[in-house]
Amino acid sequence: MSKRLYYEEPYLQKFKGKILEKIKIGGKPALILDNTCFYPTSGGQPNDLGYIQGVSIVDVIEDNEKIIHVLKEGIEEECGDMVIGKIDWERRFDHMQQHSGQHILSAAFEKLWNADTVSFNLGDEICTLDIMKDNITSEEVKKAEILSNNIVLENKPIKVYFVDQEKANELNLRKIPPQKGDIRIVEIKDFDICACCGTHCGTTGEVGLIKILKWEKRGVKIRLDFICGKRSLKDYYWKNELIKNISNKLTIKDTELGEVVERMLEERKETRKELREIKEKLQEYEAKRLIDESSIRDNGIRIINKLFEEKNFQEVRGLVQEIINLDDSVVVLAGIKSKGEVEGAKILFACSRALKYDMNRLIREAGKFIEGRGGGAPNFAQAGGKKAEGIEDALNFALEHFQEFIKK
C-alpha cells in the first residue's frame, strides 16, 4: 500500500520514499513506493509529472492501493531503497485550480438551475463539464459564472477530510461513491460539499478567475468548456492583445469593435453580391463574344474550340454552361491549363440540348490523350488527367471528330 501524501498536503512538492517494488509497465521501468506526492490519473484529473532521482516520470497509475510511477528510464542503483521525488509544481497547482473551480461551477449550476454534474474532464488546455439540463441560455450561463466568481472572491476555505459510510450518508453530498471504507470529502464552507479524491486549493481565492468559454447541447446534457486561474489569465492575454491590434488597425475603440465588424460584414455581403452580378454580366458578355467569333458550319452548327490558361476549372465550367444556354446550336470543346492549380489537365465538352451528340462518349475517348478519366451527361461531360501536354491533342481529336461527323 502506498501512502498518499497529497491527501494530507497537496502543496508538498518534494518527498522521500522507500522502494517497495520495481516492475515494468509497457516496457518501461516503474516503481511502487511506500509513500508518494504523485497523483495518479483518476476522477477526471490527469496524473502529476515530475522526477524521481532526477529521472522523468511519464505516467502515474493507480492499482488498487498501490501507486505506480512509470519512469522514462531506470534510476541508478547507487541510491539504494530510498529515493527523492519532486513533482512538477506548475502542473500540480494548475490542476488544483481547475479541479476546485469545477466544484464551484458544479455547485453553482446545481443551486441555480438544479443541474446535476454528470462528468468532468481536466484537459491540458480546456476543462469540460457535463451537466444534466435540456437547454441553457446565455443569461443562465452568465448567472452561474457570476455566482462562481463571487465564491472565489469571498475566499472561502476549502476543507478536505475523511468520513465513514454512516457519516457520509448524513452529509448532503451530491453523490456518494460506491467504494468501501472511508470516503474523502471536499467541502467549500457554506457552499458545497461532495466526495472527491483529487487535489484542491486551500481557499476559493486561489482558484482565480473562472471563465466559461462555450457550451453545446449533447443529447439530454449540456457540455461546458471552462478554464480557471492562470489559464484564464493566459486566455485574457491573447484575446486582449488580439482585440487591441485589430482595433488599432481599424483606428477605433475596442468597445466599438463588435459594431464595426457587423457593419463590415454587411458591406462585404453587399460587395460580394455586386461582384457576383458583375461576374455574371462579364461571363454573359464573354460567352456571346466566343459565340460570335466562332465559325458557322454548313449545317448551322457553331464549334468553339479553346484552350483556357487564365481561368480555373469552375470559371470555365460556368462560361461553357452560359454558352450552351445562349445558343441552341453550339458545340464547345474546352481545355483548362490554369496557373496556380494542381498540376494536371482538364477537358470539358458540351453542346446545346437541341443537338443530339454524345459528349459523354467523346470525353472518354479524348481523355486518353491526357491519361485521364471522366464522364457526365450526353450534352455536358468533363475529364481530368495527369498529362497536361496532351490537352491540345485531346481538343484536336474532338474537333476532327465533329468535322468528320458534320461532313457526313
What are these regions (language model features)?
Residues 91, 111-221:
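Functional cores that coordinate and move charged inorganic groups
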Residues 201, 205, 213-262:
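A conserved active-site cap/scaffold subdomain adjacent to cofactor or substrate pockets
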Residues 1-81:
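Conserved nucleotide-binding/hydrolysis modules and their immediate coupling elements
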